């Protein structure tokens, strides 16, 4: 792995946790459980060892951003314009992006109690299923061409310029964009942007999404481990879908366990693994920080861009 990250400094978990003075986790076990995704695994010790030092590092980047903005305003002889601090979080399906994003949102809210900390997922910028069907792209859902990148870039541009912005809302229960529903963002102090595609931009050579980020994180793991987590999550989703006939996954909920596993493994290999290897993992080096997970979901190595 180290050969792939020649512009990164490798930091062990043991070394990383010393970069923050021991403190309380800033949240309870119940709160941590409520923000942990299906089949993810995170403990209070992980919060203290990994995420509190990360919050410190984000603060370093935020101060640097503010100092640069101030220096630019002096140079240009203009009033300083405070801009949202945008954090991009990427990685494979089922690697734990959502848990990390929600945890960072909560910790930033606790460490910056007077700041507005918002979270948006790029799922909302997928084209609606009907459009994907009309374009023959439904089986490419999640691949770069299934996202409305122009809309996503316009959203980020509005956010960065301090304007009110609106994002479509995606529901995993119906596997589609929710019609006529928007999430509004009114000049937040922090915005976390989470999605498999946050370092990609296949449709627009003008700029990348990452051009808008002040800090960025890639969640990394061996693909064989992610496959296991994906299958485990799929089985958990089916268990929940049995109670809701309107859930998209209810159609698979009655499958025998062996067939459900075979179905999930096929989806992983033909869709998610291909997407990971061709489009997601190659963008990994655009991140400022890479968090590597071992088979038990624990972060064992950290890579910080030099």
Curated annotation (Swiss-Prot):
Catalytic activity: (R)-pantothenate + ATP = (R)-4'-phosphopantothenate + ADP + H(+)
Biochemical pathway: Cofactor biosynthesis; coenzyme A biosynthesis; CoA from (R)-pantothenate: step 1/5
EC class (word): transferase
Keyword Transferase applies: yes
The name this protein goes by in its record: Pantothenate kinase
Gene3D superfamilies attached to this UniProt entry: P-loop containing nucleotide triphosphate hydrolases (3.40.50.300)
Keywords: ATP-binding, Coenzyme A biosynthesis, Cytoplasm, Kinase, Nucleotide-binding, Transferase
CDD domains reported for this sequence: PanK
Similarity remark: Belongs to the prokaryotic pantothenate kinase family.
GO term, biological process aspect, one: coenzyme A biosynthetic process
NCBIfam families xref list: panK_bact (TIGR00554)
EC identifiers of the protein: 2.7.1.33
Pfam family, any one: PRK
InterPro entries assigned: P-loop_NTPase, PanK, PRK/URK
GO molecular function: ATP binding; pantothenate kinase activity
Subcellular localization: Cytoplasm
CC per GO annotation: cytoplasm
